[in-house]
Structure formats: structure tokens, C-alpha cells
């Protein structure tokens, strides 16, 4: 696929269809988690339902990073400026790490208060924190996946991320009952198991995307100079991503 030369209607099909399928499986991900939470107890289901608005902070950040990384790297590819392509790629990774640390600190410190503001009982709050704390500890994997994928997406490769979402979805289905109810030497974790299953699935996604990116021809041109932070790239990424993150939140 050549984004600069191929027929536009064909490009739209090649890009949009895999992305749409990936989004479908991402939505099914949450439906599966909700189903298994209902198998634990009504309180666990309530806790998970009230966790989603908090968890959505990570989703919003991921979308913001995706849009910023894809658009800025894509524009640089269109300009045939390989220096900017690699600079934006390294800076979007650094930016993603910084955002994930900020989100983790916020979530771990304020999730309990958010549950209380939503009128949750002590039991629902405690169950919700068991889930959200795991998610926030692993937020770096959620955001790093989309940071790395921004290069692939900008090049027109939406199939890799689609395939990763599908595989992680089925991995999540397998892990959920094992970690929630226990199996052989694995203890029953309850609602915490849903968080652990999600985290393992995201770690799996991160490893697959990382391997794919490391095989990319552009990565061979990376030198230590591209890892020296430059304000202009951070500024452009910030102003591309932050309005999206704020509007979604």
C-alpha cells in the first residue's frame, strides 16, 4: 500500500474496514468484562459499570495520542521528511509515557473519591478500586501500544492493530474465567481477575506491536540523536492531542 500513489477510494477501503473491525472487537472487550462481572455478584457488576467512566480517562488519552501521532507522522511522510517522521515517532513514545504516568498517579489517588461522588457503597467502592488500581498500574502498556502503532497507522497499516485487537479479545475471553474463578494452581481473584486479564491482554498487544515496529525499515535509521528531546515536537504533539483528550473526558 502506497498512501502517496494508490487510488483514494481503494485506500479508504483498505484503511477503514480493518480499523472498523478493530473498533468492534474493542467494544466487545468491555461487553465480555461486564458479562463476567455479573457472574461474580451484583456488587461486582455495579463496581465495574462505575469503573468505566474512570477507565475512560485512559481510553481518551489513547485516542488523543493516536490522532496526534498518526496525523503528525502521516503529514511528515507526505512531505517526504524522514527526519520529522522519526522525530515525531520517538517524541510520541516519550509523550505517551509521560501521559501514562500522569494518568496513573491521578487514577490511583482520586479513584476512590470519584466512586464516592457517584454514590457508591463501601463494598462497591472497594470492588471498583480492586479493578481500577490494576488498570492504572498498567496504563503505560495501554498508551504505549497506540504510541508505537501510530507509525504503522500513519504508513497505512491498520491490519496489524486490527489483528492484535482480535487476538487480545480472545485472550481476554480465555483469561477472564480462569483468573476470576481460579483454575488448578491459579487462585480465584474475583473482580481483580478481570483487571489482571485486561492487563495481560494489553501486555500481549504491546509485545506484538513492538515486534512489528522493530521490523519496520524506518526504525533501522533511528540514531541516538532522535532520542534527544526537542520542544517543538512536544509542543505540536500536545496541541494535537490535548483538545481531543479534554473533549472526550
Segments predicted by a language model, with ranges:
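Alpha-helical transmembrane segments of multi-pass membrane transporters/permeases
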Residues: 96, 152-178, 192-195, 199
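Short alpha-helical transmembrane segments in multi-pass integral membrane proteins
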Residues: 1-18, 73-140, 188-242
Amino acid at each position: 500500500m502506497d498512501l502517496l500513489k494508490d487510488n483514494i477510494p481503494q485506500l479508504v477501503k483498505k484503511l477503514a474496514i480493518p480499523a472498523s473491525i478493530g473498533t468492534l472487537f474493542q467494544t466487545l472487550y468491555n461487553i465480555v468484562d461486564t458479562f463476567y462481572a455479573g457472574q461474580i455478584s451484583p456488587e461486582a457488576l455495579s463496581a465495574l459499570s462505575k469503573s468505566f467512566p474512570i477507565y475512560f480517562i485512559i481510553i481518551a488519552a489513547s485516542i488523543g495520542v493516536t490522532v496526534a501521532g498518526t496525523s503528525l507522522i502521516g503529514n511528515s511522510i507526505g512531505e517526504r521528511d524522514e527526519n520529522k517522521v522519526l522525530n515525531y515517532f520517538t517524541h510520541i513514545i516519550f509523550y505517551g509515557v509521560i501521559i501514562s504516568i500522569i494518568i496513573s498517579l491521578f487514577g490511583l489517588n482520586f479513584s476512590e473519591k470519584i466512586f464516592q461522588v457517584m454514590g457508591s457503597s463501601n463494598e462497591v467502592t472497594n470492588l471498583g478500586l480492586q479493578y481500577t488500581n490494576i488498570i492504572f498500574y498498567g496504563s503505560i502498556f495501554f498508551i504505549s501500544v497506540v504510541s508505537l502503532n501510530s507509525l504503522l497507522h500513519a504508513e497505512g497499516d491498520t491490519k496489524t492493530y486490527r489483528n492484535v485487537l482480535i487476538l487480545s479479545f480472545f485472550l481476554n475471553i480465555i483469561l477472564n474465567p480462569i483468573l476470576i474463578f481460579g483454575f488448578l494452581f491459579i487462585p480465584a481473584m474475583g473482580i481483580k481477575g478481570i483487571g489482571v486479564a485486561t492487563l495481560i491482554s494489553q501486555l500481549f498487544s504491546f509485545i506484538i506491536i513492538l515486534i512489528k515496529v522493530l521490523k519496520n525499515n524506518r526504525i533501522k535509521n533511528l540514531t541516538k540523536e532522535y532520542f534527544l528531546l526537542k520542544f517543538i515536537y512536544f509542543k505540536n504533539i500536545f496541541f494535537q492531542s490535548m483538545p481531543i483528550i479534554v473533549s472526550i473526558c
